[in-house]
């Protein structure tokens, strides 16, 4: 369970959901534990005690002294940046002493390796990206279920991977398929993780403060791929396509692409627009033999004789219940992942039609006097808001602002100029947003509260428009979390509905 170490003494840094899961897992397998948190009484300390875990707890600032006294393994919670001023010296000291630094994902990967020695061989699907992870993960899990597999969905989406694995072991019900949503934080401390199929949906600026820069952030995303992982890549994203294997490499892993244009290579996915209808399609080689070639042989064959590609219609895009072109891309990614582990197409297509989406992700909560009120409170970065505006493809009054996390807001200018009737600015970084959008020609208005912004947006919107809450920012400057921000938005829309003599 712990590589070449038997019941090591483990230092767990951070007692959030993931840290608590690691502590439970290590205690279950006989490890001695020291747990440290910068908070003197973290909320999960009571849960640790209730679980009967015998651990030394140290509250307060981190220091290298925490690894003294026989620590053999350091477990790092995903919320803690290894670059943080109080943590970097500790991590450096651990590495100097040859002490491994793992995150929960590495513990999970090591556990699967151990279970594999006893015959457990599940398929593992992994999803990362700046935006769309939760939607694609939930959808991929549903598709695998519709194909008749037992499925466990875990990771960044919650529950923690180790908690889900413990539950499955205790129930003697290990799943056929694991579908994991993984953040850059979780991937940063993974070393041996090697899923069967994985996707990077997109890479745009986010968490730059945590990683120290965009290059490090993108590199962390790339750690999702093992040596033989089928790579499902967004061909519309140049940063993602940097992870495409070299075409000439004989031992390169298989790669599949998806995008919002017509696919041109056998096995890729995309959109075909024909007679006013957008279709989800798969590119197929008309001349392909019945017996599939290996990826390396297929590349050699295609280099010598370019395939004659036909586009196989899968379903109309408007048959999806999730709105927006970005969600069509998410659907293609989920379908490609399921097909990459050899699941049959027919039940997957039924699942695509069935999926209703996740809350706070371009969710239409009301239509009042012809105006859609759209909750995209989970849109906590610039890329998410760009995707929401382009995906809805309708005139909108945008509500944006909050804690910008050091992002560059300039990429918002073009979609705002194209789609927005006006922008309501809220939160701490409203001035930075105003500066980035100043030359768009779109009216900008500052509001002290979200309620005020919603009311003003509703007054400006015309029938056929959307009032879109897609802040491009984190919420903690004004709200408890993004769900609280969404609740305030919904409440404000409910007030407008009541004034119009209706309810949501």
Swiss-Prot record:
Its main location: cytoplasm. It catalyses: UDP-N-acetyl-alpha-D-muramoyl-L-alanine + D-glutamate + ATP = UDP-N-acetyl-alpha-D-muramoyl-L-alanyl-D-glutamate + ADP + phosphate + H(+). It is found in: Cytoplasm. One of its GO terms (molecular function) is UDP-N-acetylmuramoylalanine-D-glutamate ligase activity. Pfam families: Mur_ligase_C, Mur_ligase_M, MurD-like_N. GO terms for cellular component: cytoplasm. ATP binds at residues 129-135. InterPro entries: Mur-like_cat_sf (IPR036565), Mur_ligase_C (IPR004101), Mur_ligase_C_dom_sf (IPR036615), Mur_ligase_cen (IPR013221), MurD (IPR005762). Keywords: ATP-binding, Cell cycle, Cell division, Cell shape, Cell wall biogenesis/degradation, Cytoplasm, Ligase, Nucleotide-binding, Peptidoglycan synthesis. It comes from the Bacteria. Pathway: Cell wall biogenesis; peptidoglycan biosynthesis. One of its GO terms (biological process) is peptidoglycan biosynthetic process. Signal peptide: none annotated. Its EC number is 6.3.2.9. It is an enzyme of class 6 (ligase). Belongs to the MurCDEF family. Cell wall formation. Catalyzes the addition of glutamate to the nucleotide precursor UDP-N-acetylmuramoyl-L-alanine (UMA). NCBIfam families: murD (TIGR01087). This is UDP-N-acetylmuramoylalanine--D-glutamate ligase. It comes from Burkholderia thailandensis (strain ATCC 700388 / DSM 13276 / CCUG 48851 / CIP 106301 / E264). The gene is murD.
